[in-house]
Amino acid sequence: MTTDTIVAQATAPGRGGVGIIRVSGDKASDVAMAVLGHLPKVRYADYCDFKAADGAVIDQGIALYFKGPNSFTGEDVLELQGHGGQVVLDMLIKRVMDVDGVRIAKPGEFSEQAFMNDKLDLTQAEAIADLIDATSEQAAKSALNSLQGEFSTQVHELVDQVTNLRLYVEAAIDFPDEEVDFLSDGKIAASLGKIITKLDSVQSSAKQGAIIREGMKVVIAGRPNAGKSSLLNALAGKESAIVTEIAGTTRDVLREHIHLDGMPLHIIDTAGLRDTTDTVEQIGIERAWAEIETADQVLFMVDGTTTDAVDPHDIWPDFIDRLPKNLGVTVVRNKADLTGESLDATDEQGHKVFRLSAKTGSGVDELKAHLKSLMGYQSNLEGGFLARRRHLEALELASSHLALGQEQLEVYQAGELLAEELRMCQLALSEITGKFTSDDLLGKIFSSFCIGK
């Protein structure tokens, strides 16, 4: 870990009412003596002059001094809060760097120091960047919950439960004559079942948190000329796709990134799905299926003039049977302006069915509201947390180890192999909070932060 003292502008570049310079490290007190002429009282706001080496006043403002470990980074920290002119702030940084041993901070280095000094775990550090980047009230609140440790607490609870069960299993292994009794008395199976249930719950919350942070991928799919491109244009609010009466106009994947009340949504328009001998169209259809397989939700676009059916299995059973398991499907009966259908939404065989006209826009707002609800918009605004792709991958890995461990217990009565799967599960979960994390991953995470954070 670095022993350098670091400095950076903590406020955004450019003009502003207030500009803040942050200093962290052993030399923070030396910087205070050089720039202020005295060391401010710890945790008190001190209004004073910020001076150049020759004693000339660079600016006037408030100095705050925090003695480590009682600071954000866990080190001595000095904050100089002055006027927000960029020239003044640059002059002040240059003055701070006159002190030997002080250098410009790397992106995210203040947060990295806080992590290294156990002031934050990795999910809390990531939440700082997510809070800054939040595009909706929901995302901001969820990021704040993560910063306050809601996600970390749930992960720590899981790690503790896995660790305790592992110790119990290893104790059984230490007494080989009694190992079979230990493994078959039901206590281990019950404990393992509770952990799996808890992990499933955390995974579900994390997936919702990832959608709030990263956006939901929605693929519009269906037969040619069902109105898929018209729906893309209606959702995007602009003419993104060419729309004609000719079937097969869309031959490639079209993407639009939009926000619904701040909630990020990735909309994918695809080629119409059908049997064809056209080589180019076949490629487009293959790409359509590739997008469907990685989607969070599919909008199954149906030309309402061709069928009265609302159950997707009745409309096109082969299409539904090919979809990935657990992929959400919303049926969109289009061309209500021609069929005269009422613009309402119903539940049919576990699927939401919307009736609308992509051409006129009637009923599209109701579909947008549905998509927002799928992303968790205003759903339990006080709860929830944000999650990243790496968190989901770690939770999935932990879940797979628990499943293998359950198999070792129930099928093979193999205590040592169960203990090993529990150990691997423990490592996967601990990587989320940064207890066991590679330096390469840490570098990648913190380098994406703002300088000064």
UniProtKB/Swiss-Prot annotation:
Stored SUPFAM superfamilies: P-loop containing nucleoside triphosphate hydrolases, TrmE connector domain
Protein's GO biological process: tRNA methylation; tRNA wobble uridine modification
Binding site for (6S)-5-formyl-5,6,7,8-tetrahydrofolate: 22, 79, 119, 453
EC category: hydrolase
UniProt-annotated binding residues for K(+): 225, 244, 246, 249
This protein's record includes keyword Transmembrane: no
PROSITE patterns: G_TRME
Binding site for Mg(2+): 229, 250
Recorded GO CC terms: cytosol
TrmE-type G domain segment(s): 215-376
Co-factor: note: Binds 1 potassium ion per subunit.
Places the protein is found: Cytoplasm
GO molecular function: GTP binding; GTPase activity; metal ion binding
Keywords tagged on the record: Cytoplasm, GTP-binding, Hydrolase, Magnesium, Metal-binding, Nucleotide-binding, Potassium, tRNA processing
Residue numbers binding GTP: 225-230, 244-250, 269-272, 334-337
Main location: cytoplasm
UniProt KW Manganese keyword: no
Cofactor(s) required, per the database record: K(+)
Pfam families, per the entry: MMR_HSR1, MnmE_helical, TrmE_N
Quaternary structure (record): Homodimer. Heterotetramer of two MnmE and two MnmG subunits.
NCBIfam families the UniProt entry points to: mnmE_trmE_thdF, PRK05291.1-3, small_GTP
Protein's UniProt name: tRNA modification GTPase MnmE
Phylogenetic classification of the source organism: Bacteria, Pseudomonadati, Pseudomonadota, Gammaproteobacteria, Alteromonadales
